[in-house]
Amino acid sequence: MNQFPNQPGNFGQNYYKPVQGSIPANSEATNFQQNNSRENKSECELRQNSIAASMSAYPNGMYAGAENHNVENHENYTMVGHDHMEEVYGDDLVNEPRIAYSSDIVATFDGKDFGSNLHVDDTLDQQWAHFAGKQQHPLEPREIPFPVTDPLNSKIEMKQFTNIAAVLRYRGVHSAKKTAFIILDNKGKEFTSITWEKLASRAEKVAQVIRDKSGLFRSDRVVLMYRDCEAIDFVVSLFGCFIAGVVAVPINRFDDYNELSSILTTTSARLALTTDANLKAFQRDLNAKKLHWPKNVEWWKTNEFGGFHLKKKAEMPPLQVPDLAYIEFSRSPIGELHGVVISHRTILHQMNCLAAIHATAPAYESDKLDYLSIDREYTEGLSKSGLFLTYLDLRQAIGLILGVLHTVFSGYTTVWCPQNAVFVPGLWANLATRYRASFMLTDYAGLKTIAYNYQNDPKATLGFSKKHSVDLSSLRMCMVDCLNVDCEFQEIVSDRWLKPLGNQNPRATFVPLLCLPEHGGMVISMKDWIGGEEFMSPKGFKSPRTPENEISEVLLEKEALKLNEVVVLAEDDKARRQSKHPNTIRVGAFWYPFVDATLAIVDPETQVLCLPNIVGEIWVDSPSLSGGFFALPKQTEAIFHARTSFISSDTFQPIPSNQEFLRTGLLGFIRKGKVYVLGLYEDRLQQKVEWVDNGKQDTIFFHHYTSHLVNTIMRKVSKVFDCSAFDIFVNSEHLPVVLLESPAANIPTEANGNQVVINYGLLDLITTECVECLLEDHQVRVYCVLICAPFTLPRVTKNGRQEIGNMMCRRAFEHGTLPFLYVKFAVERAVLNLPVGEDAIDGIWSSYASGIRQNLLSDQELQYSGFIDRSLRYDAKTSVDISSCHTMLQLLQLRVAKNAEDIAYITIDGRGREGKNITWRKFDQRVATIIRYLQKKKYIKPGRVVVLMYTHSEDFVYALYACFYLGLIPIPVPPLDHMRLSEDVPAFLFLIKHYYVSAVLVNSEADTALRAKTTSQHLKQSAMAAKVVLPSFIVTSKISKQTKSIKELNVKLDPICLDPAFPALVWAFWSPDHRLTLTAYNHQTLLSICQIHKETCQMTHKRPLLGHVRSMSGIGFFHTCLMGVFLGTTTYLLSPVDFANNPLLLFQIISKYKIKDTYATFQTLNYIQNQQPTKWPNLSCLENLMIPHDGRISAFYIASLQKYFVKHGLSPYAFSTVYSNCLNPFISTRSYMGAIPTPQLLDLRALRHGLIQPCESADKPYALPLLDSGMVPVSTQLAIVNPDTRELCRVGEYGEIWMRSSANAISFFQSTDPVDMMRFNATNSDGFLGNGYVRTGDLGFLQITSHSMGPNAPVVDMQLLYVLGPIGETFEVNGLSHFPSDIEDTIERSHPRIARGGTAVFQSAGRVVVVIEALGQDFLAAIVPVVINSILDEHQIIADVVAFTSRGNFPRSRLREKQRGKILASWVTGRLRTTQVFYIRGSGEGEFQSSYVPDYNPSLRSTPSVSSRSTLPQRVF
């Protein structure tokens, strides 16, 4: 019979020979698919239906394997608790399934067209054609050729029992006095034991109490909380739940309260069974941790229940067990908690298979010794069916299956000892001899300790007991629970431990177990003697079984394995002899698949059956497997109901199977029917390898397995306690990472307990050895290595033992939460795909790179705006022609002449009350008073420089206009801040000395501040040290008032003051670094600023103005001092001090006086937001809230501000950002645009090339949200120009923003710097723009977008300006340009321990340096990879140095702005106060990472909360 009609020849017939006793495919196949239940069917009938189904499960005759266990089990556990189906299938704990993602579609950045293109693999059909007819088909399930009987009574067939609880009742009657369980202490002495009769009696009692007193229904969940030494109480409660018809939920971790609460919540358990001692200990733990008892849970102490006593003539209660038996909770490789449901039928299926395997295990003559010749102290009462010895946890996984369930099923006696007992040399072998152990369950960790102790000191084992010598001849199976077979060690155990201690066939005795601890601990492969090997091997070949081939292994070519190909160089004995050859890997086999299992090797990415000799994921289907996860339907569907595909030879298309499999997550292959496992899918590393062959670049991926890398590290790197290896996906590349635990990372302490400096030289040596050995042995180019102290990496519990969890390590590494002390990078070898610009030397502004962009965008328009001239015309208030006015003084005289009694200024106090009204007449008189006083001073003449140091008051305005009249050059500056005298005083003295200040005009408040003891002494001492002669300080508010007006004083403006080159006003701008910039404005410019502002913002004299903060320059200055005079309206003044005390006062004034247009800084709005005021006024009158900025706008910050203020009544259309700088306070604005700002997504990859390209999604790591700065106002023209070639940029690229406006400053005050002079009167290379342009020094672009002009308004095209940032802050790496703000934003988002606004990125001596203000100074090495990865992933560059400063040492200005210049200067001079410095590439002058002693806390596993990132209160005035 050919089962594969589409395959050539008789491949299927030869490869898969039908099992004897199977039935034709056409007789029962259809019936099987209609009736999936195994109820009321014999094992033979089930087997026949399974074979019949296997021949029809796949389309086109493809083999499908055993009966669909998932169909049955899915039915089983979905029926659990018919009243609780919704609860079982709840979505509340659905996690992401473990699914690998295919890389058929890859998004790449094309350097030619600078675009993001999707390249689709069009060769997929050819790949399928390569698979067709060549795939490796699943291995058939084998049949048990004999009935499984009771080992104690061969007449009793075990198939008559319908559940495991019935078997216990049977044992309690027919093996009543035999010992069931024996518990030993750490020294091997019997601690407690129980017979089958007592075990059954106590279990019946627990079941009776649950039925009578708990109020639970069938299938309700009951939690079991017992410690490992309380195994007997655990078994009693477990079977008590089985008998009572409830579902048991074992919980093994009491120290994790969150896990306990999660399990109780998920399972809705209302009853918990435990012991009295355990309950008291749990109570103490809760009290110590200040936790509350879980709610709605009743706690019972089962050790007080006693036994069950049946009344006379009464019958045992009938067993009415539900489908589910128990739910075992475990953690996935990535640490996710989930419960696996186990049904009673699943238990019986597996027990039958295990019993058959154990029954066929070879027994030897010495195993049939007369028990009278053995010490009766230990052997009396033991079961004659066999003795089971283990130290694994009996409450979970394989320990529960073999040590408890199979013990009951087969009637064994189980002897359990704690894991610590294996560390006592000779004790384990003595226990096996003492109890004549037939079966032994261990793991590698314990067995290695036992075997190596014997190798080091054989006498300790041989002479352990004087009563009898060690003899393991009775041992039939030494089962080892493991993930990989350690070939070298199994030789040691077989030949150097079992054989010397009397075992006659040690290689047959050693049995590796391949279990699924994540899926209930089920066995999927182990050594057996059932037969059926001829159906597993190719062409039905069956090799004779000898002691030599009881251990199967192969020697593989290492290079081929990197490509997922299996190339066998030698097998078995030859493999052992040739294992020392280089470039080979020795891999051991478990055995054939489990008896009733269908096993397939599947490509984890495509889910298609693999070709022969190809590594793939092991998928298995068996009635002995669990049905799925509890309350996780999505994950259950993905993991337990996976369907593989077969490639049709006719259509070359994948055809899904009808059979469902369990995805084990194990990677391996099949050879001659035997299963070889290389590791978990999550533990496989891959790395890209590139080379050039004949001018063509080729790329492949090499795969490496964590177990192989770990073994190499442990063998070759000194001082390594344990380690973990994994890869991370950064910048579209897989980068290997190694985490080491080393005693060298223990923080040393002196005798007095003080911590001493860590030996970083030794740590560097260890990491270097690790990098080099992996490169030499495996060609793995390690990305980074980190070191921490032993027992600090995340661990998972397996068989009661803690093992490093690679995926948990990876997650903690990516979050930067592990306590690492040292990190070493090897990026030069590992990172391959760093982008390079068109001109790697001269950068994006070179002629070559610019020419490429120009050619690419040759069909696009040039970037420049239109120009609309709006000169002075008529004054709206007086209807007077003011086109002939040249100064603000003429408009002031117009107000005095026409509206003398109108109110000019009103001061508002801290309570919102109005001060004295200042009419235009009084305003004129106050100005005249100061003029008259200053005229008497001989040293004050036209053209002299004076400093106006005033608080926010009308006195400042009076002094300003007095200077205008006298032809003085005023420089307004704020008063000295007594908290920052070290910055303010030097800047003030610099101003006096270099600009020859003749006088300093102050008011009373400023004078009081200057006369303060601290300030005056600091000022005088600094002046003496700097050899600066302080000018006169004139308190203008104390001048005697007079009633004469300016006109009566006959004050006339000096004609020289009307010269366009004469600076009527000088604005002082301090950068965050407190570097001073002075820009000069003439009288005509001041008028133009007011005119542009009036026209753009539609301002009239009918609405008042408000001046509050930042009144010394910019928008705040002309709102406070000029616009009121220009419009002829009232100006209200609010002191910044009063605003700071009552932030809501600002909006109360706006609402009360119906102010339509005003301004506010970002610091002002942020201060209001942080204060969270209540009782907001009505803000419907405010139509234009201008927010000046001099760089790029944060889209997220604006969105948060807008959301907050809109919630309190401000119109979303009122937010108007204004782009301004020291050369023009009103370059562009969003005022009255009628459109809500919408971020535009730009592609960062294109931006580095100088191009503007939209990004398709905000989820992309290279997406940059950018807000526009509005439209160009009247009398202003902008152009985007290449800063180097001075050519106009085209649409699609960005350049420097040039501006031509009547509001431009006339010069940098008294500057002779050629660079400063070059910025004025600039012209482009071809003269197209003409003259009169000023270079802003900022990069940006113009773009036409369509917006609606308000609600229900038509859509119009607008030309908007987008500002990217200062050109002086950008730096280039590999010919690509980067904005520090983008990188800093990435860094601050990467880790919660990085302070907000606490990063600075700059380039120094060719290195990219990152300075970070960290919250807390312990284990900073864990943050470094997070920072480097985030920069590499989003910006494709590698930072060369990462330096950390402590809280408060990061230089900031008084407005909490980072001081970039000061940071750079401090770094270059070595004066930056750093805590630790990490050199990513190279080191600084041969030094290692800075010596630093952290506050060590072994329990540190988490980072500070986000709330710890709050900053100090910000000053806004």
From Swiss-Prot:
Keywords of the record, alphabetical order, are: Glycoprotein, Membrane, Transmembrane, Transmembrane helix
Could you tell me which CDD domains the record lists for this protein?
Dip2
Q: Name one GO cellular component term.
A: membrane
What Gene3D superfamilies would the database entry show? 3.30.300.30, N-terminal domain of ligase-like
| Membrane topology according to the record | Multi-pass membrane protein
**Where does it reside?**
Membrane
Glycan attachment points: 35, 40, 76, 917, 1178, 1321
Q: What's one GO MF term for it?
A: catalytic activity
Compositional bias, Polar residues, is annotated for: 1-13
> Region (Disordered): which ranges?
1-26
Q: Which GO terms describe its biological process?
A: acetyl-CoA biosynthetic process
Q: Which domain of life is it from?
A: Eukaryota
Which positions, given as ranges, span the membrane?
Answer: 231-251, 397-417, 510-530, 612-632, 720-740, 956-976, 985-1005, 1051-1071, 1114-1134, 1261-1281, 1353-1373, 1408-1428
Alphabetical list of PANTHER family matching this protein = DISCO-INTERACTING PROTEIN 2 (PTHR22754:SF32), DISCO-INTERACTING PROTEIN 2 DIP2 -RELATED (PTHR22754)
Give the family per the record.
To S.pombe SpAC22F3.04.
Record protein name field: Uncharacterized protein C56F8.02
Name the source organism.
Answer: Schizosaccharomyces pombe (strain 972 / ATCC 24843)
